[in-house]
Amino acid sequence: MSKILSFGQPLGSIMQTAYVVDDLEAAARKWTKTLGIGPWLLLEHFEADNMTYYGEPTDIDLSVALAYTGSMCYELVFVHNDVPNVYADVVKDKGYGCFHHWAVSTETFDEDVARYKSQGYEVAFYGEVRPVGGKRFAYIDTRKDNGGMIELIEISPEVEGLFSMVKGMSENWDGKDIIRRPE
């Protein structure tokens, strides 16, 4: 049996679905109104180091909003600047509001990246997230086979803590304070 992470998903399973939006706060409010998902934690100007886009350095500036319903995390992504990036690649084909990727938790990051590469997939976006101790993420471009990308998220106590905190915000939520920012 797989290890169950503190936010309710088995290690190695899909833990998040993500969508690209053109207005983060407006989209979060619409998702709350139509789907009852919330509250949303808004992480503005996402802090990551060593980011690459298909192997080339990128200075993408993005913000994300995270929220839960049950044990599934939803991520809304907004890009602030006009540099080549994985989000613009998908918006070009599908428009804003579109599905972008599934995120999968991993404790075997390097092996998982190598496995996808051996299957002919490319790492489209990579970075090391500052607020969670430099833990890594990699977007694998699997669009040709499943219509979306797969984000590998390297699990650590800090990463687990972030997702558990966001999930905890949704438990017994009274529907108020839809948008929240880190203190």
Show which residues each predicted segment covers.
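Short Pro/Gly-enriched beta-strand edge/turn motifs at strand-loop
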Residues: 45-51, 120-124
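A short acidic, often aromatic-flanked loop/helix-cap motif at beta-alpha or helix-coil junctions
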Residues: 48-50, 130-133
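Short proline/glycine-enriched turn/loop segments at secondary-structure junctions
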Residues: 128-129, 138
